[in-house]
């Protein structure tokens, strides 16, 4: 992923000033503080536990910065947003457009993963391709996949699953399959 902290802040509509980090490049985005490596941007999601509880751990593990819905101390680089998940999704949509990769989407009641894998394997004979890993096919997994694709990707095959009414619409709006 080739994005600077300043560019990310601009895309997601950060509520704080990050101009001091204009040239600071982010390696990748992680929502699991245990998987953070040096130069990553941490994404604190709310689930069974609030990911904000793990911001300090993420910094200790090498995070360069974090998204946050709460003010942090001035010595920590952060992007203040109203909703971290929404910011993550907005960033993924921007990144897919910026890279101009061809997006292929697979959805349905049964056979999504097998179909996605087959399409990927066929395209990989001619193009540099990337695909949804496992079944990361929801409102978190799809943006995660998009933001983790290699920089030289020409075709990305995204699996889209639905748990709630409107999920496919959301994912299609983010990915804009062609």
Feature-to-residue mapping (PLM):
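N-terminal leader/targeting and accessory segments in enzymes
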Residues: 1-90
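Phosphate-binding loop of NTP-binding sites
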Residues: 10-12, 88-178
């Amino acid at each position: 992923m080739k994005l600077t902290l300043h560019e990310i802040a601009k895309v997601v509509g950060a509520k704080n000033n990050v101009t001091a980090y204009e040239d600071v490049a982010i390696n990748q985005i992680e929502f699991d503080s245990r998987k953070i490596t040096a130069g990553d941007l941490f994404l604190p999601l709310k689930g069974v536990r609030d990911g904000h509880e793990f911001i300090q751990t993420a910094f200790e593990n090498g995070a360069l910065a974090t998204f946050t819905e709460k003010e942090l101390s001035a010595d920590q680089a952060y992007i203040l947003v109203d909703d971290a998940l929404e910011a993550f999704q907005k960033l993924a949509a921007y990144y897919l457009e910026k890279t101009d990769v061809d997006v292929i989407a697979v959805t349905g009641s049964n056979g999504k993963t097998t179909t996605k894998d087959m399409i990927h394997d066929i395209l990989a004979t001619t193009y540099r391709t990337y695909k949804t890993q496992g079944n990361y096919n929801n409102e978190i997994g799809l943006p995660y996949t998009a933001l983790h694709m290699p920089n030289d990707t020409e075709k990305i095959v995204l699996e889209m699953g639905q748990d709630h009414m409107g999920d496919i619409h959301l994912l299609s709006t983010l990915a804009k399959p062609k």
